[in-house]
Structure formats: C-alpha cells, structure tokens
Amino acid sequence: MRFKGLDLNLLVALDAVMTARNLTAAARKINLSQPAMSAAIARLRTYFRDELFTMRGRELVPTPGAEALAGPVREALLHIQLSIISRDALDPAQSSRRFRVILSDFMTIVFFRRIVDRMAQEAPAVRFELLPFSDEPDDLLRRGEVDFLILPELFMSSAHPKATLFDESLVCVGCRANKQLSRQLTFEQYISMGHVTAKFGRALRPNLEEWFLLEHGLRRRIEVVVQGFSLIPPLLLDTSRIGTMPLRLARHFEKRMPLRIIQPPLPLPTFTEALQWPSFHNTDPASIWMRRILLEEASNMASGDQEPPTRRRC
C-alpha cells in the first residue's frame, strides 16, 4: 500500500530497525530475509533523502532524521494495531494476551501475586512479563514496549493517564535477636547503626528514605546497597544492621523470618503506588479489562490489608 509515494510496509521495517539497532535482528523480528531488509532501508533512505542509520561496530546508530521519524512511526503503527487489528471484543477466558509490566519487587510480592492467582482462575492463558524498574519508564510507555507501570506516583510523568492504587508507609526492620533494638528506635541509634538500603535501576536511583535524608542534610552509615527491597531482610539476620522498607513488605517478611518492625524515629514520607498506561491504550479492550482487575485488587487489598494465603509447598 502506498501513501504519497511511500510504501507503508517500509514503516514497519523502519520501526523494527529502530528497536533492534541491528539489521539481522530486525529482519528476523518481522519475518524478512536480510537482503529484503537491506533493500527496504535503501528505499527508505531514497524516499526521506537521509542516511537514517550509520554503522558503529555491530550497531546501527540512527541519524537525527531517523530519531525524528521514530516516535511518529511507532505511534502510527500502534494506533493501527489497536484500532483495527485488536478491536474485537475481549473474552478473558480465551485470551492469550501478554502484558508487560514494570514494577518493583515490593509490588510483585505484596500486590501482583493477587493478580496472577486471579488470572489462573479467570483467564488461564493470559501471560505476564514482569520487568524491573527502568531509568526511562515514560519512554517505554510512549514506544508501546510496556503495557503498565506500577510505581510510586512521583516517578510517573503527566504524559500518560494514571490511577491511584493505594498509599504506603515506610518502617524500619531489624533482626529480632538484635539486642540494640527495642520497640522504640532513637534518632541516635538510627544514624549510628549500619544500614542495608535499596536503590533502583541501572543508575541506582535512591529510594524515598534516601531522598528525605538528603533533603534534610542527614547522613547514616550505609553498609550494604541492594537492588530491591526484598533483598534487605536476609542481610539483617544475625546482625546489628537495620533497613527501611514498605510496611506491607515488612509484614510479609516478619511472618517468614525472625524480624522486628520498628517505627522510624523521623517523619519519613508516605507514598502512593499508582498504575499508568500508554494513552493510546485508553480504548484497548484488553487494557481496559486488566486495569479494572488491577484497581479491584488494589481496593480489596487496601480494605482487607491482608496478603493472600500462603501456598503449600510443592
């Protein structure tokens, strides 16, 4: 199909190369031979009068002209997919949709297990790909590479729609055998004790506790930095270290490890976990259905404030 002299199939090839940054991988992605993909790129270069890609080692690096085309082309292809190809009514029991979700280990353990358990009953063929925190989550949404973000609201941009899931607070956690810990933690103890702290993404972004301390000019003794809250508890056992983590996750581990939950001696901020999706998914039946499930389970959890029953070991 042509539009103003451009074969629209070439836009699929352009999008594939922009994503893969490799001619062979891009050709494989859209079921073309490598010579056919090379010919498609040559035709695109002629049409746009731009080199589009240059080689750097084994990677194809887009020119500024290709970068300018990438967003509009990706959005156009996604709109076609959602408006034409995916417009059929959704039957959850028969759906084999795969949802790609960026969320923290905290939300995976405390919240998303509910979703997986529910889908096993209502939509057993639905699949999930749960991804760790990205340094550029908004870009992944914009490119349609993920279906949902489940993150603290302050990490979300205003470029896409979002909905509140629930509020959460931070608590301190230590080994139950730690004789330095009483039911009340003093500020002096908090500052002087060794800490295990979580940071996120490749850039190791600080968590909310770290932001609060930096903002108030406070420093503590950090002994271990881990990627994710769920790695904190094992590093507290049989030590005098403490860690700070979301209350619901602390309760989860308190039932499984000899840990003690203590209120922090300073007013650490609460935060809101939220759900965000690409704006072009607003009318996608599968996205609408999954958003309803996510919001229902968040409401159920907030009202009951209990985690799902522990499964029996296999």
UniProtKB/Swiss-Prot annotation:
**Classification via InterPro entries:** LysR-type_TF, LysR_subst-bd, NodD_PBP2, Tscrpt_reg_HTH_LysR, WH-like_DNA-bd_sf, WH_DNA-bd_sf
Q: Which UniProt keywords apply?
A: Activator, DNA-binding, Nodulation, Repressor, Transcription, Transcription regulation
Name the record gives this protein:
Nodulation protein D 1
According to the entry, every stretch annotated as the HTH lysR-type domain falls at 6-63
An example Gene Ontology molecular-function term: DNA-binding transcription factor activity
- Which part of the chain engages DNA, per the record? 23-42
- Top-level taxon of origin: Bacteria
**Belongs to which family?**
Belongs to the LysR transcriptional regulatory family.
Q: Does the keyword DNA-binding apply?
A: yes
Q: Which PROSITE patterns match?
A: HTH_LYSR
Record field: transmembrane: none
Extract the Pfam families matched here: HTH_1, LysR_substrate
Q: Which GO terms describe its biological process?
A: regulation of DNA-templated transcription
Instruction: Give the CDD domains listed for this entry.
Output: PBP2_NodD
What this protein is reported to do is described as: NodD regulates the expression of the nodABCFE genes which encode other nodulation proteins. NodD is also a negative regulator of its own expression. Binds flavonoids as inducers.
